[in-house]
């Protein structure tokens, strides 16, 4: 719907986790469905994604599902407020997708730390498979597992959400080169490998890449 912005990697990472072929790791880090064909639908340019943006994307999928053979839609975005699916246009489009044979999967949201832990559209739609997050602390020890601040129901319509819990952190995924995220990752790798007496010089040589590191270094002087 829009020209891709190379600085935006939020939706691309789930795509790779779902269907990546692991080419950068010789197949070691592959997605759950590496043989899948992926249709990338760009909802907006850099900045905020609105309910209307998501609705437009789903309507495009409905119109083009047969042309591209689309059977599953994954959405890594959510709306702005809790709304009943009976009156919410975005939720209604989710139901239309389901009626057309398209499975809609959506992140349930990151508001589990809020008092009302709201589940918003499209995840709150009855036919949407909402996915919550698990933090396994990068360990196979079940005792170390915990939730990752995911939103949860009941929804405003009394529906229990999410339907599925999946790992949401400690997942290997590629980072788009030459982006702020990639620069921060490279800097953190340097710091991790450096001896203590080299930490401040490295931070001083890379001012502006990670504001939190800059602020921490300033406080120590």
Question: Where would I find each of the regions flagged by the language model?
Answer:
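Subtilisin-like serine protease catalytic core
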Residues: 1-52, 66-71, 99, 124-128, ...
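Solvent-exposed loop/turn segments at secondary-structure junctions
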Residues: 24, 44-48, 79-82, 110-114, ...
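Short beta-alpha junctions and helix-cap segments that line functional grooves
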Residues: 26-28, 90-94, 115-119, 149-151
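Short acidic, glycine-rich surface-loop motifs adjacent to enzyme active sites
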Residues: 58-85, 107, 210
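Catalytic-core regions built around general acid/base machinery
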Residues: 89-104
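Glycine-rich, charge-decorated loop segments at or immediately adjacent to ligand/cofactor-binding or catalytic sites
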Residues: 110-125
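Extracellular S/T/G-rich loop segment that most often corresponds to the catalytic His/Ser-adjacent loop
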Residues: 123-221
